[in-house]
Amino acid sequence: MVYFGDRQRDRNRDRSNQKVERIIHDEEFGEENVELVDSEWADFEKFICQLRKRRNSAMSMEEELRHVQRHPKIKSHAFYPCPPPAENARDSDSSDDDDPIGYIDTLMYGRYTKDLGEFAKDEARKLKILEKRRKQEDKQRNKELLGKHSTRAKRVSSWIWRHTVARLGEDWVFLALLGIIMALLSFIMDKGISICTNARIWLYRDLTSQPFVQYIAWVSLPVCLILFSAGFVHLIAPQSIGSGIPEMKTILRGVQLKEYLTFKTLVAKVIGLTATLGSGMPLGKEGPFVHIASIVAQLLSKLVTSFQGIYENESRNSEMLAAACAVGVGACFAAPVGGVLFSIEVTTTYFAVRNYWRGFFAAVCGATVFRLLAVWFQNADTVRALFLTNFTTEFPFDPQELFVFALIGLVCGLGGASYVWVHRRYVLFMRSNKRMNKFLQKNRFLYPGFLALLVSSISFPLGTGQFLAGELSTHEQVTQLFSNFTWSRDDLTVEQAAVVTHWMTSYTSVFGNLVIYTLFTFVVSIIASTIPVPSGMFIPVFKIGAGFGRLVGEFMAVTFPHGVRYGGRLSPIMPGGYAVVGAAAFSGSVTHTVSVAVIIFEMTGQITHVVPVMIAVLVANAVAALLQPSIYDSIILIKKLPYLPDLLPSSSGMYSIFVEDFMVRDVKYIWHGISYQKLKEVLKLNKTLRSLPLVDSPDNMILLGSVQRYELIKMIEKHIGREKRMEVAQKWQKEAQERALEEEKKKQEVELKMRRPSRFEVLPAPDILSLRQIANDEMLPPKKRAETMHGSLAPRKSILKKTNSFNLKTYAQPMGHSPSITPYTTITGNSEFRIRSAFEAIFKKSTTLQDVQPDPETGSLSPAASNHEVEVPRTPSTPGVSKKVQLPAQSNWDFVTDQIMLQVNPISTESNKMPAEKDFTDKALSNNGDSSKQSPSIKFKANKVADVNRSPQTAKRCSKIRFANEVGVNGSPTRTKCKIKPENVLGYSIEDVDETTNPESLAESIQKPKSVRLPRERVIDMSPEDQKQWELEEMLKPIDLQKANVHIDPSPFQLVERTSILKVHSLFSMVGINHAYVTKIGRLVGVVGLKELRKAIEDINSNSFVPPTRDEDADEKPAVEKPLLSTNSSDKAVDMTVTSMDSALSNSENCSDIEMEHIKHTDKGTVSLTMPPQESKQSPSADKSNTENGNHA
């Protein structure tokens, strides 16, 4: 308030002076400009007030941090005991702007514009925030750099793996385990699906008297299961929605899809698929099983990687994923051979033959265990096929029928292409309707519930479901479609008639039901596949083809009731064979695979129709491939997954378009001799790049190799990390100690040279200090008083120079806190010594004072004294530490020492005691109180009495007792340890006692020995200012990659700039690379990744690719592109940073891993702030391409 009052008076005085000046000005120049002057002066005063308010207002946290970083203060030595060796530190008072508390020089006295208390609180708050950020970023850096730490459990697991599984063959055990796990999952899921389906049919059949209740029971269960599956999948892992084969096809191509191979996705996929198929919706499980097997393989690889590093290799991981795809199909249909071939056709374009045995072995293990589980738990008589058929093997078909089979393949090819087209158009229609799409996104359960209700209502057996065999499950429907008797025949057995009753009604015949069933499955499967739940597409199209083939077979049986004549022999028509051919042809046309023929043979257990099946599948594939892509490629296009498409044969530009037409020219690179600061800038600005090309210099751009991002970050961490910083801090401390010792030595030498020897003895005159000392000595115990008297009777020291004519006597050892007394001690030194002695006397007096309210039980020795047990009270090391001291601490300590010496040598000890000491000892022994309640004590148990006639050496050795006062980090006492050396022959056993004043804890601690915990070692680190300055200097140094032991890939994949896009596509597809560097005569000119190649191929296939115009002058230049950092920029003018994550100055909200400060060094060595330069604007395509290349490098 006084401060603001002074400011107000000064302001009024200034205004009065200014008003007088304005009056004089008006009298001289007239009154016409008075109003103008007043308005201008009012504006000026308003501006000054705003300026003062802005100056007096406290800066925000970000501004304060920037202020501190821009103007480093003088280095602190209060809490960091290791100053840097540089002595030309910047003075904090060199500039007025450097004063953080706003000191202003006035006419008489200085004045502070800020509250010191608030300033201290702000500083403490900033330090707390910086420390918190430092710890968080330290954890992030450890996670990125340090990787996995080896633990004892991992080492044990590694040892067990090496001596058990590794000896049998790692891949064999891994693949067998993968197959067994998938078989178990498939069996469990089938069991759950059958339970849901049987429950639905049981409810329908049990409520025959009430049709409406039957309808409710028939509809409610599918709706509930679909809603549960949709909600569960959406909450746990939305990545599990759909088939999974398109995603696996993309992943095996080298693209990393986030969260698609995690444990959460596995749980959501298994539970969601079980609920979906249990609802009775026309969906399949083959695609989801491929995804599930891939997830299991990925999780097993991570498990094995923890104690076997071979599975960390990306190529080995992709091999295991390829085998997992085969296991998924094999465990789903018990078809190992067809599963391997199907997974190869569906997921990969170029397959490595070395993975064949892996896929076959894992698929055979899975299929075998899956069928054995059916024998063990489903009462199967033996290992059988999934859809067992019993076609006659003598004449299964006639050659004339091959034409009909080919016709079935042609129709199925057209139908498969139309199926894919309708599916894609329906999905795009649902997406294009933005209003409906927005409404369905807000109401996620409305669309799945409505479709489930619609499909189950249509399939209700008492309604339209009687035309669709609605009472049958999917397995029963396929089994009956594959039956080897003619449904339209009149002479049917009871079992055959029971089968036909599901496929004909009183309103329709077998043909009508088959047509309705095929069309219904065709339409509903397309609609149901859009429900956001895990589902497959293979079983629905398999059923569609089986229904169409059965329809053709029944038509052939009616047309040729006696069979087809060939070579004088009639062969009967088997409609079941036509159903098998139709199922293989339609599913092959939709998936664009030929291996479905092998799957059909394994599922039916017969190869009687191998020729018709192969002919139909080939014709259907040929027709469908010309019209539409496969269903999985169509989903890739719909989801816009980053998969590399194929070049169409009709593309005319595949030979005239080169890699230089679509490569990225803005390449991020490093070079030999790059500084650590520039390297970190490159890493910071390109966080998604996992490798960087290495060139010789920014001028020549000769490609020398590539370096992984992890290696570069580890190199920076090694250069200025915590270990390096601690080493430098220790070195600085050592140098500081050496300098301090040298300075002290020089100072003593100078003092000795300046002092002149005297022949006289300097004696201090009696003063108040000496009188106070005498008064304090009288209050001391007898022994200490005798020692003080003995010390006072010692002869005074002479200050004369020691020569041959003088013999100085031996002087007593000085006290612990007193200065060393030399023959040249002056009066000042003696005065200081007397002052310290006076304070020590006061402290000793405080330790001997009685408590104001003494304990009535105080003053007696513990009962253990009668059993030769002695309690040794501890004297507090610092006055005032112990809150309650009942006995004179120093007297008790002398008493204990005398008791030990008495047992060692009682004769000599008793004879050497003074009378006062004997009286005190006798008085102390006469007490019967428990001294353990008074102060911390140490108990000595005399197990055997020592011999009286011991040597003085033994007595001296036995009396050595060591006390280790352990003090914690904050100065709090922890525990006290006391022991006698092992060579003690008395047999004393010393117990550790906690230093505390609680009697109960003391009693417990005396009875039970406790361990001793050593205090934490003090870590010597730099101050934030020193650390910042040191890191700035270290970051300016150039990098020597050879000394840094950085692993450099000397042969990264390179392409010449004139390589055609056809060769680039073939190389990327066969080799499986994700990016390649483009060179011109050895110089790096660009980089191409999957994104650029895919975009170019799509444009070429659509005839919309426009090659960029080439600049002829640019080709003549030696350097095609300007480097990321200009070559003329020196290391002294680049952006500086504090890299270490545990630095207090390396935290910022706008930078996640590495904070960068922008400063420049002047010629004088001072640091001045510069604004960060604006980043060069890149095209969006370049940024995206670099991001994608980094993700797949």
UniProtKB/Swiss-Prot annotation:
Residues 663-723, 1048-1105 form the CBS domain. Chloride binds at residues 243, 538, 632. This is Chloride channel protein 2. A motif (Selectivity filter part_1) lies at residues 242-246. Changing residue 286 to G: In RNA edited version. It is found in: Membrane. The gene is ClC-a. It comes from Drosophila melanogaster. GO terms for cellular component: actin cytoskeleton; apical plasma membrane; basal plasma membrane; chloride channel complex; plasma membrane. The CLC channel family contains both chloride channels and proton-coupled anion transporters that exchange chloride or another anion for protons. The absence of conserved gating glutamate residues is typical for family members that function as channels. Residues 1-168, 627-1193 are cytoplasmic. Voltage-gated chloride channel. Chloride channels have several functions including the regulation of cell volume; membrane potential stabilization, signal transduction and transepithelial transport. One of its GO terms (molecular function) is voltage-gated chloride channel activity. Residues 76-97, 848-884, 1103-1122, 1159-1193 are annotated as: Disordered. The keyword Nuclease does not apply. At embryonic stages 13-16, expressed in a subset of the midline cells of the midline primordium and in all of the midline glia. Expressed along the Z-line of the sarcomere in larval longitudinal muscles. It is a multi-pass membrane protein. A motif (Selectivity filter part_2) lies at residues 284-288. A motif (Selectivity filter part_3) lies at residues 536-540. Residues 245-252, 320-332, 336-344, 576-590, 591-592, 593-604, 605-609 dip into the membrane without crossing it. Residues 1165-1193 have a biased composition (Polar residues). Keywords: CBS domain, Chloride, Chloride channel, Ion channel, Ion transport, Membrane, Repeat, Transmembrane, Transmembrane helix, Transport, Voltage-gated channel.
